[in-house]
């Protein structure tokens, strides 16, 4: 391409390229609205074919570093760099593109399109040796970086993505590899972000993001691998967040966030491995919380954040914080959509025992037995009620002592007022109402009173009742103690 074939605006860019000088077409500086770029005239319009020619075979000056640095231009046509190898940095900020650039399979040292307006962007399977900066860009079409390798940071701060279709993604980052951070605080999307299979060596920052895709995925990040933190503080998400099979080495922080996807899951984090999961200081999730088969080292979960329906089957956590009374944690287990999940109760009890709160652990185990009772047949429920009333399933042993003392007082008083007659007056020992009642109550121990005396009338029925009650009490005590000892 000859310089004589270029417009005055293009000639400025051509001449500046060899020395890496910046060409700024803006008239209002940073206050200019790039969205009005469709109205810009030829004095600031650059053909995409000219930019392509510069990047692939532009002039070079010995001792200078060539670079494409343009601000405030209207780029017409498609910037086609498919499978190209570009050795100059590309800096096209505050620009208005008529067509989506296509850099699929390209190899670049650095790409900066900040504050630009684009109808889309294709950088699939590309390699960028430095960073990709899309800060404050506005996209009206799909941005596709799937399969790309970025050696630096991917910047998406306050970028905006408009809906393309009702179900399709607006930002495709599937299987992308980022050797540094994915920095996207204040991101705005109307559609799905697809981050499945991606690998981020640093952290992912989505703080203050506004993600909108009602009834569908706002963030689908299945099998995502993050070596640092996944930060989503103060996020407002309308739609579901999916992290099935993801691995987050650091903290997954949803503090102060509002997640809303009524009648479906708001957070799907099944089969995840997470260092720390923070769900705190926000309103209750509007939608289900799915943590099935997840493994979390530290679960920071405030009871106020838990939604009306959860999935906690096979969830494993080492530490549960903040420390709350068992009465505030148990409702979460009762909201499990799968009904009675014994593993969830065992996990909670283990977490309490780990911090030395044995009382709370016993309350959880008691609640587990009561929940199990509700799943049994009528005779199983009846036996459960007996165990609960007598010894609290073995977790309230003092209750057995109260029953024993109460029955002992009733029997002793009754037989003290009306002595049963001796079976053999010459051989009978002196009658003692207390030990006679103990003989009736205790199935194994004998004080010689029961065999020597026989009550009559309703006192005989009282004796039968004491014997039956004693056997029931002894059986429930043995069952409860066995359950407690085996658990220890």
Task: Give the residues covered by each predicted segment.
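Pore-loop/selectivity-filter region of tetrameric P-loop cation channels
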Residues: 389-397, 419-467, 476
């Amino acid at each position: 391409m000859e310089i004589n074939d270029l417009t005055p605006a293009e000639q400025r860019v051509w001449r500046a390229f060899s020395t890496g000088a910046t060409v700024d077409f803006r008239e209002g500086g940073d206050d200019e609205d790039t969205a009005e770029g469709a109205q810009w005239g030829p004095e600031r319009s650059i053909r995409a074919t000219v930019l392509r020619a510069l990047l692939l075979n532009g002039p070079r000056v010995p001792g200078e570093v060539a670079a494409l640095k343009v601000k405030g231009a209207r780029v017409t046509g498609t910037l086609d760099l498919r499978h190209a190898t570009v050795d100059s940095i590309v800096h096209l900020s505050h620009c208005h593109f008529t067509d989506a650039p296509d850099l699929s399979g390209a190899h670049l040292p650095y790409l900066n399109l900040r504050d630009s307006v684009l109808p889309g962007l294709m950088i699939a399977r590309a390699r960028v040796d430095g960073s990709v900066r899309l800060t404050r860009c506005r996209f009206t079409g799909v941005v596709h970086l799937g399969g790309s390798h970025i050696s630096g940071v991917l910047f998406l701060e306050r970028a905006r993505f408009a809906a393309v279709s009702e179900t399709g993604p607006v930002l495709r980052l599937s299987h992308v590899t980022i050797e540094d951070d994915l920095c996207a605080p204040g991101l705005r999307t109307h559609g799905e972000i697809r981050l499945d299979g991606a690998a981020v060596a640093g952290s992912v920052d989505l703080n203050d993001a506004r993600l909108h895709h009602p009834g569908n995925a706002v963030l689908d990040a299945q099998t995502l691998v993050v070596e640092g933190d996944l930060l989503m503080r103060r996020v407002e998400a309308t739609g579901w967040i999916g992290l099935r099979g993801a691995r987050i080495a650091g903290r997954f922080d949803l503090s102060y966030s509002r997640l809303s996807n009524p009648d479906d899951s708001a957070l799907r984090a099944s089969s995840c491995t997470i260092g720390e999961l923070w769900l705190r200081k926000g309103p209750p999730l509007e939608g289900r919380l799915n943590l099935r088969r997840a493994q979390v080292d530290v679960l920071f979960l405030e009871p106020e954040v838990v939604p009306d329906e959860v999935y906690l089957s096979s969830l494993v956590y080492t530490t549960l914080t903040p420390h709350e009374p068992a009465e505030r944690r148990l409702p979460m287990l009762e909201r499990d959509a799968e009904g009675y999940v014994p593993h969830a109760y065992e996990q909670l009890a283990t977490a309490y025992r780990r911090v030395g709160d044995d009382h709370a652990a016993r309350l959880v185990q008691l609640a587990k037995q009561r929940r199990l009772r509700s799943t049994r047949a009528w005779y199983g429920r009846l036996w459960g009620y007996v165990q609960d009333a007598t010894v609290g399933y073995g977790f309230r042993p003092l209750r057995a002592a109260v029953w024993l003392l109460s029955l002992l007082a009733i029997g002793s008083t009754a037989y003290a007022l009306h002595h049963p007659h001796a079976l053999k007056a010459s051989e009978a020992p002196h009658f003692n109402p207390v030990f006679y009642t103990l003989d009736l109550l205790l199935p194994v121990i004998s004080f010689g009173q029961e065999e020597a005396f026989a009550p009559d009338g309703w006192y005989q029925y009282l004796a039968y009742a004491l014997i039956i009650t004693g056997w029931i009490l002894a059986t429930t005590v043995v069952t409860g103690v066995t359950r407690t000892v085996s658990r220890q």
